[in-house]
Amino acid sequence: MSRIVAIDYGRKRTGIAVSDTMQIIANGLTTVPTHELLDFITNYVKQESVERIIIGLPKQMNNEVSENMKNIEPFVRSLKKRLPDMPVEYVDERFTSVLAHRTMLEAGLKKKDRQNKALVDEISATIILQSYLETKRL
């Protein structure tokens, strides 16, 4: 099987997670500056066998997409142009940052480490992907 890549898109930084080849477990991969994201994903897909890309869909509590969607849509269009055969799906990302902070607390990370926004973004991408993998198994 191939891997699945998840993206927690941000204006400055973007967290990236990847599944194992059996598509059971999500692991944080890295956080990259958003302006380097398209090249990073393109290179990763060339090096690894990737089945699809999951993008965190920023929704508000009232179920409407948030302001950040205006930044995500142009990226997704560029991604689809560069990788036309790669399926791209959106997955609701509500509460992933809150869950990421909770995960860091439960893991016993020190306050300084919990304030590392790049780590929060990477963990958020991991939560998005793990949620997708679990939903897919149902």
UniProtKB/Swiss-Prot annotation:
- What are the annotated GO cellular component locations? cytosol
Classification via CDD domains: YqgF (cd16964)
- Keyword Hydrolase annotated: yes
Keyword Cytoplasm among record annotations? yes
The molecular function terms in GO held by this entry are: nuclease activity
**Keywords, comma-separated and alphabetical:** Cytoplasm, Hydrolase, Nuclease, Ribosome biogenesis
**GO BP term, pick one:** rRNA 5'-end processing
A Pfam family that this protein carries is RuvX
EC id: 3.1.-.-
Broad class of where this protein is predominantly found: cytoplasm
Note the superkingdom of the native organism.
Answer: Bacteria
Q: Where in the cell is it found?
A: Cytoplasm
Q: Which family, according to UniProt? A: Belongs to the YqgF nuclease family.
Listed PANTHER family:
POLYNUCLEOTIDYL TRANSFERASE, RIBONUCLEASE H-LIKE SUPERFAMILY PROTEIN (PTHR33317:SF4)
Extract the HAMAP family matched here: Nuclease_YqgF
What this chain does, per the record? Could be a nuclease involved in processing of the 5'-end of pre-16S rRNA.
What protein is this chain from?
Putative pre-16S rRNA nuclease
Could you tell me which species this protein originates from? Bacteroides fragilis (strain ATCC 25285 / DSM 2151 / CCUG 4856 / JCM 11019 / LMG 10263 / NCTC 9343 / Onslow / VPI 2553 / EN-2)
